[in-house]
Amino acid sequence: MRKIHLALVAFVLVVMSGYALAQQAPAPARPVPTNLPEWAWGVMPPAPPPQPGAAPAAPPADDGSILHLEGSSVGLTRTQLRGIPSIPDWHPEDHGPMPDIVSKGRMPAVRACGFCHLPNGRGRPENAGPAGLSVSYFMQQMEDFKNDLRKSSDPRKGNVNTMIGFAKQATPEEVKAAAEYFAALPIPQGWVKVKEVSMVPKTKIQGNVYFELEGAQAGKEPIGNRVIEVPEHGQERFEMRDGHAGYIAYVPVGAVKKGEALASKLQCSMCHGANLEGLGPVPALAGRSPSYMARQLFDFQTGARHGLWSDLMKPIVAKMTAEDLVNITAYIASKNPPAADVRQTARAKPQSRHSRPMWNGSTICGSISCRFVSGHSRV
């Protein structure tokens, strides 16, 4: 049985590495910031050069075997696990009917959203978890990708380049359908479990994700100034895209308390809600992947994200240190979203890059005013 599991993991790795290479849009020739928090990006060591005359790895043929996953009554073939003709959905009871753009996509222009972000929208450390995002926020992010206003500080982050390509190809109807589907899904509780440690399990990096080493390679090492986020149930369930298999985020001892103090100082709750559960079009933060959150904060800091409302975040992140990123993302990830959906879902249409958010009165977001007057604030 162990050999079967290993063969399955190897099969999925071959398939996904081929997909990633085929789908990544060319990255611009930009330098990598010298202060990049590599733990958040899962930066992989350079691959060895291919052997002369070596044929590219190919996935094993689908022999029709039905694969099963613990906790699911669904059975899938290897072809179905690759997302053909629709994404692997081990837990259809988690959600309502999926629109075609989420379940099938429109290949080759647009990959199915649910393949990478999962049918329940919980996402994975290397990407985003769109579950529970308001329709207006989701659509605005797609506009930002489309208009090159949302990139990655690290040009090697291939799936961001891929998202930019998808956003340029997706129709407004497809984007809206995906936005409405994910907005209706609950923000998951306990998806990320935060553990404060001084020593962290040794890991390897594959596909920008950390996996705990096993066997003779297993061991511990100092965590240092990092967050190490790993699949809670190992690599096999991760590679099979199990939407019930969450993550463990190992953080330095004391990081959560320090992050709480920093969030209070920056008054994050003024815009993101009292419990960071989101407020109107402002996204929920509680319980989200610390790897993802650190990338976004750093992208605001470097200007890689400079879409609508990014000016509100710039003063917040301007002086954040590498330690601040670790602490505040540890705190954010440690907070569970509310059991009931108390978010105020925004109904407004996404604003263009030439429009400005309008606020009544002087609402304060952190240390800066959220009040904008149309035409007077650069985005």
Show which residues each predicted segment covers.
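Positively charged n-region of N-terminal signal peptides that target proteins for export
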Residues: 1-4
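Short cysteine/histidine-rich zinc-coordinating motifs and their immediately flanking basic loops
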Residues: 124-130, 280-285
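Extended intrinsically disordered, low-complexity coil regions enriched in Ser, Thr, Gly, Ala
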Residues: 131-160, 193, 286-292, 296-297, ...
